[in-house]
Amino acid sequence: ADNRRPIWVMLLSSYWQDGNSLGVDAIMTNYPEDVK
C-alpha cells in the first residue's frame, strides 16, 4: 500500500470494498441454490 495516497482515496477504496462485499452477500442470499 502506498501511504502517500490522499485520505479520500483510502476511504473510497474501503467504501468500494465494503459495498462489493455487501452486494455479493445480498446476491448469494437472494439467488436460488442452483444459481449459486
Swiss-Prot record:
Q: Which UniProt keywords apply?
A: Cytolysis, Dermonecrotic toxin, Disulfide bond, Hemolysis, Lipid degradation, Lipid metabolism, Lyase, Magnesium, Metal-binding, Secreted, Toxin
Q: Which GO terms describe its biological process?
A: killing of cells of another organism; lipid catabolic process
Cellular component GO terms, alphabetical: extracellular region
Per the UniProt record, the source organism is Loxosceles gaucho (Spider)
The uppermost taxa in this organism's lineage are:
Eukaryota, Metazoa, Ecdysozoa, Arthropoda, Chelicerata
Membrane-spanning regions, if any?
Answer: none
Q: What is this protein called?
A: Dermonecrotic toxin LgSicTox-beta-LOXN1/LOXN7
Record field: catalytic activity: an N-(acyl)-sphingosylphosphocholine = an N-(acyl)-sphingosyl-1,3-cyclic phosphate + choline; an N-(acyl)-sphingosylphosphoethanolamine = an N-(acyl)-sphingosyl-1,3-cyclic phosphate + ethanolamine; a 1-acyl-sn-glycero-3-phosphocholine = a 1-acyl-sn-glycero-2,3-cyclic phosphate + choline; a 1-acyl-sn-glycero-3-phosphoethanolamine = a 1-acyl-sn-glycero-2,3-cyclic phosphate + ethanolamine
From the Swiss-Prot or TrEMBL record, state where the protein is found. Answer: Secreted
Q: Which family does it belong to?
A: Belongs to the arthropod phospholipase D family. Class II subfamily.
What this chain does, per the entry, is described as: Dermonecrotic toxins cleave the phosphodiester linkage between the phosphate and headgroup of certain phospholipids (sphingolipid and lysolipid substrates), forming an alcohol (often choline) and a cyclic phosphate. This toxin acts on sphingomyelin (SM). It may also act on ceramide phosphoethanolamine (CPE), lysophosphatidylcholine (LPC) and lysophosphatidylethanolamine (LPE), but not on lysophosphatidylserine (LPS), and lysophosphatidylglycerol (LPG). It acts by transphosphatidylation, releasing exclusively cyclic phosphate products as second products.
Q: How is the cofactor bound?
A: Binds 1 Mg(2+) ion per subunit.
Comment field (misc): LOXN1 (pI=4.41) and LOXN7 (pI=6.38) are not the same protein, but the partial sequence of LOXN7 (AA 1-9) is identical to the sequence of LOXN1.
- Kindly report the protein's main subcellular placement as a broad class: secreted
Cofactor(s) annotated in UniProt = Mg(2+)
Modification after translation? Contains 2 disulfide bonds.
Provide any one GO MF term from the record.
toxin activity
Q: What is its EC number?
A: 4.6.1.-
Tissue occurrence: Expressed by the venom gland.
